[in-house]
Amino acid sequence: MFRLKTLTILGSKAELSTLPEGKLLINTINAHSYNTALKDPLFAEALSCGDVLIPDGVSIVKACRWIGAKSQPRERIAGWDLFDYEMNRLERESEASTAKGESPKTVMFMGSSQKVLDMIVKRAAEVYPHLKVSTYSPPYKPEFTDEDNRAIITAIHASNPDLLWIGMTAPKQEKWTYSHWSELDIHCHVGTIGAVFDFFAGTVARAPLWWQNHGLEWLYRLLKEPRRMWRRYILGNTLFLKNMLTEKLSK
């Protein structure tokens, strides 16, 4: 059974620097993904069995404390925090490599539309000038065919990335990556961070720092897009509280 109490969750942003090198699957969890996982066994398995799970929500941090969970994260680690850390790490490595006459490091963005990916490539050239950027936009459909999956995997292998971002929105991105993990012959960290694609491309604005620092980024998004977000944040947060009460009262 999927339970927050028993999940292993990273404790702080500082711990990102302790992650081992090599093939590593990094997922995020928030109140919405927790609620979704309770109804989706494959998504629950993907979150439970990935290599690293980061608390992308103040609600997760507070809930872990309240229910006495095994993991006690000390702060929220947003998907953007993971992205920022990993991209800067790879930029430094790539700068050192190119200074020695070696090939630049490659970051790959798999997911989203070609329009968004083109914007990502343009901005990455400005912010991370020493990185080589590759992209792949999969077809927009609820389920991929075997041919679609082979094409995605082939594109990833052709890129041979030193860092791979998967952005197809949750839970699709987590389930796809987990289901095809053994088929991916890669050597790098892989992060499932769909919303960050839009943040970095500039098609969606993050909340101002005040909202972020006070754990209110969810409220900012609700106020900006009430018709799209009310179900996720009003109904979803209420359901999350109910689920946490159930966990707290259970043995």
Outline where the language-model segments fall.
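N-terminal nucleotide/polyanion-binding subdomain common to many enzyme families
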Residues: 1-84
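A short helix->loop->beta-strand "cap" motif at the edges of active sites that frequently abuts
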Residues: 23, 104, 185-189
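Short glycine-rich anion-binding loops that position phosphate/pyrophosphate groups of nucleotides
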Residues: 31-34, 168-173, 196
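A transmembrane-helix-recognition feature enriched in membrane-embedded lipid enzymes
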Residues: 61-62, 206-251
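Conserved beta-alpha
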Residues: 67-95, 101-155, 159-160
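Short Gly/Thr/Asp-enriched flexible loops that form oxyanion-binding sites at enzyme active sites
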Residues: 121, 174-183
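Short, flexible loop segments at boundaries between secondary-structure elements
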Residues: 138-143, 186-223
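Proline-aspartate-enriched helix->loop->beta-strand connector
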Residues: 156-165, 169-170
